[in-house]
Design a protein with these regions (language model features):
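A small-molecule sensor/coupling module
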Residues: 351-352, 370-396
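Membrane-embedded alpha-helices and immediately adjacent juxtamembrane helical segments
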Residues: 1-311, 316-317, 323
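Cyclic nucleotide-binding regulatory domains
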Residues: 297-299, 303-360, 372-374, 387
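NUDIX/MutT-family hydrolases
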Residues: 365-368
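Proline-centered flexible-loop/turn and helix-kink motifs
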Residues: 73, 360, 380-381
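Short, conserved loop/turn and helix-capping segments at secondary-structure boundaries
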Residues: 235-239, 334, 346-349, 380-384
Length: 396
């Protein structure tokens, strides 16, 4: 039980630290602003494109109205009225207007793309027109997912009714919620797959993040009536701006639910890196026992860890015992909670010396060079820690 509590605290502390480093609330606020700014041209764009694929445009309009009301409950009526007026007065729009609508809606895609880069600690430099092209491709993919979602939602009620007929003990409403949740999770996972800059993410991890976002949205949906009842007093302070204030808060919460799933994916994907980071910066008996028990290698006296000109595949962390390194005739002794072998890994060279166990026995942990380099490139505190140790080596 103590191990479970310690592990839970570790996960919570590092996940909270991630949210703080990424300025999660600022990301949510920025994305919410861009979403509000580009919502009308984006909805018009979706309506115009999907109307060409579906014979009955009223179905598209009603589905978009439902989606908009979930995001901006107090403003959805005015937004959809504006969409209706624009589309009624702009029959037969040419390619120029489609280009204008894409350009007006692209800041939302740009904001989402940058959020993914921030959360996954990636830096990709591209030219302006390349980024704009990618943003337009993202918008097209989002519109395609909207089309698939609307197409499937038309048949969800019939599917739930069929399932209820086959299995009478199942409640139709429960089955409908289940099918809707599964389809929503699949669409979110596909969107995550398209947007993520990390191409090595396992499919199961994408589904976990999508499920987390879906659960948050379901929870918000259940809390909607409570939030709306609490908002009655806002009119005292905001007057005629009350509806806008409520819609902005609700939009912010929904965006936070979406980005929460992405944060969870990035956290789980980098979990091993966080464990090794704690091993270097905050070593403890609990950490070694819970996370690194299977990683510990026991060595006897005079065993050689590496020799001159051997490949640099790992950095070594000493759990217990003493290790002596010899580089160009200079000997150095390493003890508990110290590490060695990082210079060859950093410089991408072969070993410049050898390392031998000098105590009766020693316990070490191998840190893969990819993990060490990732920590060195992404974590400022770890960079300072390594630089201080390198400075000590130079001075001595």
């Amino acid at each position: 039980m103590k191990d479970f509590i310690w592990k839970s605290k570790f996960y919570f502390a590092h996940f909270s630290q991630n949210l703080s480093q990424h300025r999660f609330l600022s990301l949510c606020a920025t994305t919410s602003f861009y979403f509000l700014f580009t919502l009308i041209p984006f909805i018009i764009l979706i309506f115009l494109i999907l109307s060409k694929w579906v014979s009955n445009s009223d179905i598209i309009f009603n589905e978009l109205q439902n989606i908009t009301s979930n995001l901006l409950p107090e403003l959805s009526g005015k937004i959809m009225l504006q969409v209706k007026k624009f589309t009624d007065n702009s029959k037969g729009l040419g390619w120029f207007w489609f280009f204008i609508l894409f350009w007006a809606a692209s800041p939302l895609a740009n904001s989402l793309r940058k959020n993914f880069l921030i959360i996954f600690n990636k830096k990709i430099k591209r030219k302006f027109y390349v980024n704009k092209f990618i943003d337009i491709v993202i918008l097209l993919l989002v519109i395609f997912l909207f089309f698939i979602y609307i197409f499937i939602s038309k048949y969800l009620v019939d599917l739930a009714g069929l399932f209820h007929t086959l299995i009478p003990i199942s409640e139709k409403s429960v089955v409908l919620i289940l099918f809707s949740s599964i389809s929503l999770i699949m669409f979110i996972a596909i969107f995550f797959k398209i947007m993520t800059p990390e191409k090595k993410l396992p499919q199961s991890l994408l589904l976990v993040g999508a499920a987390a976002s879906c659960i948050v949205w379901i929870f918000l949906h259940e809390m909607f009536d409570l939030i709306m009842s609490m908002s009655q007093s806002y009119g005292i302070f905001y007057g005629s701006m009350r509806n806008l204030f409520i819609s902005l808060i609700w939009l912010f919460l929904n965006v936070a639910g979406f980005l929460f799933g992405i944060e969870l994916i990035a956290f789980i994907f980098n979990l091993e890196v966080y464990k090794f980071r704690s091993l270097f910066l905050h070593p403890s008996k609990s950490l070694l026992k819970i996370f690194f028990h299977s990683h510990i290698i026991r060595l006897q006296k005079k065993e050689v860890l590496f020799s001159y000109d051997s490949p640099s595949t790992s950095v070594y962390f000493i759990v217990d015992g003493q290790i002596k390194t010899t580089v160009h005739g200079n000997e150095r002794l390493f003890h508990n909670n110290q590490y060695f072998g990082e210079l060859s890994v950093i410089n991408n060279t072969k070993r410049l010396g050898e390392a031998v166990v000098v105590s009766d026995w020693a316990k070490i942990i191998k840190i893969p060079n990819s993990t060490f380099k990732k920590l060195l490139s992404e974590d400022l505190e770890f960079q300072n820690y390594v630089l201080r140790n390198l400075n000590k080596i130079i001075i001595n």
